[in-house]
């Protein structure tokens, strides 16, 4: 049975996330999927007449109440396997999965697998850490959907940000080779012009047959990667004077596509969005399009990619004819920076130790508070568990497996003490599922859900669960923001940086109890949804820079460091987590910060335990 793709179809027009997904499906010409357009319960089987669907795809409609249980707890788009126990949710995750499956179905189509970019990492990182994922998955679709509802002559900031990015220097693997080829092409063209001024045809580089006198070497290089067999190998080396040319003498590369030189999923995401925006902008203020010369040039180049015009015609997209002569970045764009980028520049180079900040807090009566462990001697009999349930089954040394068992003992002692039959327990940032698998095995009357953004980790967890024959466990590959289902307990072992705060916020919103082990304090920083300090009392005492000092030094707890520095690091950990605990208490939670037993189980041995009052 094929996988099922669920797309939102609420409203008079298709949401951009849905349009993007359908555009990719048309580009890949996928035939092995069952595609559902999800309608509100009251409008089941009543798709808006304004919606034009792709002509090369078969689609069905379904109402929300009939969705599979796992899909009901996720934001769309979402893909669910035939078993109904493994779901992928969120635009970036779903698009990457569609691309993988399409290439498996047609291995000869190099243009499909090249969408994933260098090392197959395009849109792999979550929006919290990747500017491109954030721009494609959140910023651009959200801004343009708002613009479409109320078009005006004001260009959204997010679109200007994309224009700015198209003017940034190209960063591409092995660019030295391509720049030398460009130098040789330029020198060859100059020689030909000198020999025969009447000739308009320059010699074609043997590496890129597709290049013409109207096509840049960069675009030719990009398009050659999208042919069935990919780019041809160079038959000969460059001449000596080309090989010996200094790097500083090589010509720069043109910014061809969104992320640089090659056509990727990023372009697939942005094309339907930018097209819809340009159509709307042209209707209200056509002259404003001239303020986006780089986007206009990109918009034309994308249309030259094999398969794009076919997908566009299938999706009822009629491209606009936009002038983009001498596309250069506008002067105003050189000074454009998002608030986030400005904040990062402002605070990235601060200096100073933690003592002044700690002293300041102490004078205000704020010191790290560690509650006693509720079950310090509680431990699972790991020897009695099936091998697949033990961390030793994962890819780690025996010494590390023992420490992992000790860490699990701490979290599991809390969860098993409060869990009741019928509870839903979510293992956030689950990785290979060490916490969730043991919980599912020990608590068969509870439903366990693993949520993890890394597909490889989740697939390993799925294999282990198959060995154990567990039927009370579900898997969701997604950023945790895309999980919207109800649950009673949330757990996270070593949630990295701001992920701890995201998990806590998710639990508080669901009024669920939580047991979280924070990690990577040095990666904590303000995000679109989360700002620091977290609690009112810490906000009154510290500014962002002072809080970041605590976070940086909270990471200095490694065993090889001097004891005094480790102790300071532990106190900084305690203060950062105290701020988190007080923030939760402001939302009517009872919260404790506890040290794991034994303390040697991890340098990051804090545990934040909370329950709604």
Curated annotation (Swiss-Prot):
An example of a Gene Ontology cellular component annotation for this protein is: cytoplasm
Q: Which Gene3D superfamilies match?
A: Vaccinia Virus protein VP39 (3.40.50.150)
Q: Where is the GST C-terminal domain?
A: 116-312
**Similarity remark:** Belongs to the GSTCD family.
Q: Where is the signal peptide?
A: none
Instruction: List the transmembrane segments.
Output: none
Instruction: From the Swiss-Prot or TrEMBL record, state where the protein is found.
Output: Cytoplasm
The record's listing under InterPro entries reads: Glutathione-S-Trfase_C_sf (IPR036282), Methyltranfer_dom (IPR025714), SAM-dependent_MTases_sf (IPR029063)
Q: Does the keyword Mitochondrion apply?
A: no
Please report the name of this protein according to its UniProt entry.
Glutathione S-transferase C-terminal domain-containing protein
Cross-referenced SUPFAM superfamilies, in alphabetical order?
GST C-terminal domain-like, S-adenosyl-L-methionine-dependent methyltransferases
Keywords assigned by UniProt, alphabetized: Cytoplasm
Q: PANTHER family, alphabetically?
A: GLUTATHIONE S-TRANSFERASE C-TERMINAL DOMAIN-CONTAINING PROTEIN, PTHR13369
Keyword Metal-binding found = no
């Amino acid at each position: 049975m094929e996988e099922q793709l669920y797309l939102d179809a609420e409203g008079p027009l298709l949401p951009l996330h849905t349009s993007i997904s359908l555009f990719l499906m048309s580009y890949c010409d996928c035939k092995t999927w069952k595609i559902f357009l999800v309608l509100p319960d009251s409008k089941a089987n009543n798709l808006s007449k304004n919606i034009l669907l792709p002509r090369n795809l078969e689609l069905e409609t379904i109402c929300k109440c009939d969705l599979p249980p796992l899909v009901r707890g996720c934001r769309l788009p979402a893909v669910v396997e035939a078993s109904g126990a493994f779901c992928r949710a969120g635009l970036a995750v779903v698009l990457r999965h569609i691309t993988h499956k399409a290439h498996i179905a047609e291995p000869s189509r190099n243009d499909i697998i090249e969408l994933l970019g260098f090392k197959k990492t395009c849109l792999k990182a979550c929006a919290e850490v990747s500017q491109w994922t954030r721009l494609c998955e959140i910023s651009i679709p959200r801004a343009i959907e708002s613009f479409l509802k109320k078009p005006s002559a004001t260009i959204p900031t997010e679109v200007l940000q994309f224009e700015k990015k198209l003017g940034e220097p190209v960063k591409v693997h092995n660019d030295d080779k391509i720049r030398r080829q460009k130098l040789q092409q330029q020198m060859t063209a100059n020689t030909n012009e000198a020999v025969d001024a009447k000739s308009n045809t320059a010699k074609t580089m043997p590496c890129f047959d597709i290049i013409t006198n109207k096509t840049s070497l960069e675009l030719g290089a990009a398009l050659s990667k999208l042919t069935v067999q990919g780019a041809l190998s160079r038959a000969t080396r460059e001449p000596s004077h080309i090989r010996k040319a200094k790097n500083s003498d090589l010509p720069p590369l043109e910014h061809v596509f969104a992320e640089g030189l090659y056509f990727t999923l990023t372009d697939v995401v942005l094309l339907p969005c930018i097209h819809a925006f340009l159509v709307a902008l042209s209707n209200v203020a056509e002259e404003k399009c001239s303020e986006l010369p780089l986007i206009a040039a990109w918009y034309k180049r994308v249309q030259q990619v094999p398969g794009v015009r076919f997908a566009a015609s299938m999706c009822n997209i009629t491209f606009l004819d936009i002038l983009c002569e001498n596309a250069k970045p506008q002067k105003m764009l050189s000074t454009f920076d998002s608030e986030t980028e400005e904040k990062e520049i402002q605070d990235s180079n601060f200096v100073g130790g933690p003592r002044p900040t700690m002293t300041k807090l102490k004078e205000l009566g704020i010191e790290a508070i560690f509650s006693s462990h509720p079950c310090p001697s509680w431990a699972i009999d790991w020897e009695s568990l099936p091998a697949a349930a033990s961390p030793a089954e994962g890819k780690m040394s025996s010494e590390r497996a023992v420490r992992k068992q000790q860490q699990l003992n701490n979290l599991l002692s809390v969860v098993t003490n409060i869990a009741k039959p019928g509870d839903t327990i979510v293992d956030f940032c689950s990785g290979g599922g060490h916490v969730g698998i043991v919980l599912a095995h020990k608590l068969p009357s509870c439903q366990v859900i693993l949520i993890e953004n890394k597909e490889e980790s989740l697939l390993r967890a799925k294999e282990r669960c198959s060995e154990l024959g567990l039927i009370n466990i579900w898997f969701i590959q997604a950023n945790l923001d895309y999980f919207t289902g109800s649950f009673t307990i949330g757990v996270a072992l070593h949630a990295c940086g701001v992920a701890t705060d995201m998990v806590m916020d998710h639990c508080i919103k669901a009024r669920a109890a939580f047991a979280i082990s924070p990690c990577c304090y040095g990666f904590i920083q303000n995000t679109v949804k989360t700002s620091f300090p977290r609690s009112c009392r810490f906000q009154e005492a510290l500014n962002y820079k002072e809080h970041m000092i605590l976070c940086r030094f909270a990471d200095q707890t490694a065993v090889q460091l001097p004891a005094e520095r480790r102790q300071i690091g532990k106190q900084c950990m305690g203060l950062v987590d105290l701020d988190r605990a007080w923030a939760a208490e402001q939302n009517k939670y009872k919260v404790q910060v506890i040290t794991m037993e034994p303390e040697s189980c991890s340098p990051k041995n804090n545990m934040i335990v909370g329950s709604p009052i």
